[in-house]
Amino acid sequence: MGLNLLPIEMDDIRKRLDREPNEIEWRVIDAVWSEHCSYKSSKIFLKSFSIDSPNVIMGIKDWQDAGAVDIGDGWAIVIKVESHNHPSAIDPFNGAATGVGGIIRDIISKGAKPIALMDMIRVGNLKIRKNVWLLKNIIAGIAAYGNSIGVPVVGGELSFDDTYNDNPLVDVAAIGIVRKDKIKPSIVDKAGLKLVLAGLTGIDGLGGASFASRKLSGEDEIGAVQIADPFAGKIILDITLEIADKVEAIKDLGGGGLAVAVTEMANGLGAIVDIEKIPLRVKNMNPADVIISETQERMLYAVEEKNVEEVCKAFEEYEYPCSVIGEITSEPIIKFRYFGKDLVSLPTNALLEPPKFLWPIKNVRKNVEEKNVDLPLESTIYTVLSHPDLVSKEWVYSQFDYEVNTSTVVKPGDANGAVVSLPNGKLLAIKADGNPDLCSEDAYECGKGIVAEAYRNLATVGARGMVAVDHLQFGDPKKPEVYYTFVEAIRGIGEATRFFNIPIVGGKVSFYNENSQGKPIKPTPLIVMAGLVQGKLLKNRVEDSSYVVLLGYTRKELGGSLLSKIFKVPSQAPKVRLQEDLLSSEVVIDAINEEKITFAKDISRGGLAASLFNIIVHGYGVEISTKSILSDTDNVVENLFSESSGRFVILTNEPEWIVEKSRSKGIVASIIGKVNKKTSILTIDNTDYDLKTIVNNYFNFLEEVIGNG
C-alpha cells in the first residue's frame, strides 16, 4: 500500500479498532496520522509556546488553521506561515504557487481578507544550474499566484547554502484583516450541519501529506505535487468572504484532502460523506483517491441546512462547482460512503489522537577553541560583502505586484520590515527571520536569536512586536542529533517569546528535509513577527554628514557568522542577551518618535560591515574609527564582522542625544563615524576601501545570475 506508518502505529490502530482496517481506511489513517498533519513528533513541545495574552483571539492552544489577535477598534489580524518544500523540489513553479494558494485559503478560512504575503526562500549554491532553475521557477510560481489573486508580496528572505542543494525551502506567510466578531472557526460544535464542498477534485496531489512526511528519494512522482489555478483561487477567495456570515465553519482542503479536513472539522463529533456527490475533475476516479486527493482551490464549509441554497448560489453565479457532500453527525465516527456502502468507518478520536513520539536526542552543541582571527582586512571586506546573502533582492521584488490593493506603505527592500496600512488607520509591520548557520552551531541560542532579530527589525521602522508564528524545518526527527537541535531551538524560541511577551499563535513543523542519501538540511527554524507602529514610521534615508552611531556592545562572537562560514573561522556562537535586544530596540523606537534619526539598521548577517555597506549603496561613503567601537576585542576584522545581538547602526544629526538616551536605558552607544559624499568608499581608520565593484554586484547579481539563467 506504500504507507508511511510505523509498525507500532499500525498495531496501535488495530488494537483501538479491534479489527484490521481495510485498504482505504489505511490510506485515510496514513494521511491523518502523517507527520505533516498530526505533528506527532512535535506537538508536545509546541504547547510550551502558549502565552496567555488578552490580545489573543485564536492561539496555538486552539489548534486551528491560523492565529488571530486583537489590534483594537474592533479589528483583528489573522496570521499564518506555511511551506511547500518537497513539492517545490520536484515542480518548483507549482510547488511554490500552491504554497501561496494554500496559505491564502487558511487566512480566508477565518473569514479574513488577505492583505499581505511574505516569501522566505532558501536554495543551494547558484553555481549549480539546477539551483538557478529552481529559484527562477519558485519566484515565478509565487508571482503568478500572488499577482493573479491580488494579494501583495511585501517582503521576505532569500539566502543560499549548499545544504539546500537538493532541498529548497519555500516558506510563505500571510496576514489577513477581519472584524474580530466575524472570525470563523475551522471546527464545529454541533451536529446536523451540512458539509458543502466548493471546487473540483482531481488526481493531482495524491498522497501529498505522506509525501511531505518522508525524505526525498529521487523517485517521487510529480503527481504528488498539486497544480495551481490562481483564477479559481480568486473565485474561492471572493466568494468565501461573501458567504462567511452564512456558514458556521470553514476549512481549506490542504494536506490529506477530505480525509483530514472532514476529520479535523468534526472536532470530536462525526461525519458522513457521500463520495459520489463530490464534483470530479477526472471521470471515474477511484473513491480512495477522491478521499485523499489534494487538488487545490477547494474549500469545505459547515452550513445550516437553511443556508445551503444561498451558499451554493453564490458559487453558481461564477459557474464554480458547489455540492452538499455530507453532514456532521453526533455519532463520533468518520464515514465515507460510496452509493450507500461504507468504505471508511473510523472513530473520530482515534484519527485525531495518533500515537505521540519522543525520539532519542544527542547533544551536538559545539565547544570551539577560540583563536585570534588573522585575515587581511581588504580582501575580507570584499569577499564577505560580495556574498549572495547580502545582495539586493530588488530583482525578486520586481517580479511581484507589491502595491496591489494600495495597502503597502513601505515597499520591499526599503526598510528592515514590511509595513502595511490597516482599516483602523494603524500601521502594521511584519518581518521574517531565520539563521541556519547559527542554528548549526547552537540551536538554543539560535532560537532566541531569531526572535530577537525579528523584534529588532520591527523596531527599525518604529514598531513593537506583538504576535508571531514559527516555522520549524529540520531533517528526520528519528535521528538523535536532528531531534536535539529541534528541541533546543524550541527551547530558545519559547524563552525569547516569553521574555518579549509575544504570543506565538500558530506555526508549522516540517521534518524530513533530507536528500536521497539521508543528509539533513541545516536546522532552519523561522520566525514571522508582526507589530503595530508605535507612533511615527521611519522610512530610511541617508543624508550627507550624518553621524554614524553604533548602538550596543560588540563581542568576539563569530560562530555561525557569515565570516565564519566563508573563512571557516573557529569561534563560539553569540550568546543572545535578550535584555540588551529589548532595551536597544526601545532606544530606536524612542528616537524615531522624537525624529532624532533618519536611518536604522539592526546588525545581523555580515555584522557591522554589512550594515555600513547598507548605507553606502544609497550612493554615499562612510568613514569610521574602529577605536570608537565599544567591544571586548581590538581586532578590526572581529569588530567589523561579529554578529553579536542587541546592536543597531543608526544615522543621526544629534548623536549626543542618542548616547544619552542609550545611557538612560542602560545600553552603550558610541559615535563611530560620519556619512560623506565619497561615493562607494568605506573609510576605516583613515584607510579608503573602494567598494564600487561590490556595489555593482549588490545591484546586479541576481538579475545576472537568475534573470539570464
Swiss-Prot record:
Q: Which InterPro entries match?
A: PRibForGlyAmidine_synth_PurL, PurL_linker, PurM-like_C_dom, PurM-like_C_sf, PurM-like_N, PurM-like_N_sf
What GO terms in the biological process aspect are recorded for it?
'de novo' IMP biosynthetic process
**EC code:** 6.3.5.3
| Gene3D superfamilies the UniProt entry points to | PurM-like C-terminal domain, PurM-like, N-terminal domain
* Superkingdom per UniProt: Archaea
The active site is formed by H36, H84 (proton acceptor)
Its function, per the record, reads: Part of the phosphoribosylformylglycinamidine synthase complex involved in the purines biosynthetic pathway. Catalyzes the ATP-dependent conversion of formylglycinamide ribonucleotide (FGAR) and glutamine to yield formylglycinamidine ribonucleotide (FGAM) and glutamate. The FGAM synthase complex is composed of three subunits. PurQ produces an ammonia molecule by converting glutamine to glutamate. PurL transfers the ammonia molecule to FGAR to form FGAM in an ATP-dependent manner.
- What EC class is this? ligase
Q: Which parts of the sequence bind Mg(2+) 2? A: D106, D252
Residues annotated as binding ATP are: Y39, K80, D470, G507
Residues bound to substrate are S83, H84, N85, H86, R105, Q226, E294, T295, Q296, S510
| Gene that encodes the chain | purL
Q: Which organism is it from?
A: Saccharolobus islandicus (strain M.16.4 / Kamchatka #3) (Sulfolobus islandicus)
Name of this protein: Phosphoribosylformylglycinamidine synthase subunit PurL
**Entry's family note:** Belongs to the FGAMS family.
Q: Which UniProt keywords apply?
A: ATP-binding, Cytoplasm, Ligase, Magnesium, Metal-binding, Nucleotide-binding, Purine biosynthesis
| A single GO molecular function term of this UniProt record | ATP binding
Q: Which GO terms describe its cellular component?
A: cytoplasm
**CDD domains cross-referenced by the UniProt entry:** PurL_repeat1 (cd02203), PurL_repeat2 (cd02204)
Compartment(s) where it occurs, according to its Swiss-Prot or TrEMBL record: Cytoplasm
Under the subunit heading, UniProt states: Monomer. Part of the FGAM synthase complex composed of 1 PurL, 1 PurQ and 2 PurS subunits.
Associated pathway: Purine metabolism; IMP biosynthesis via de novo pathway; 5-amino-1-(5-phospho-D-ribosyl)imidazole from N(2)-formyl-N(1)-(5-phospho-D-ribosyl)glycinamide: step 1/2
Instruction: State a single Pfam family of this protein.
Output: FGAR-AT_linker
SUPFAM superfamilies recorded: PurM C-terminal domain-like, PurM N-terminal domain-like
Q: Where does Mg(2+) 1 bind?
A: E82
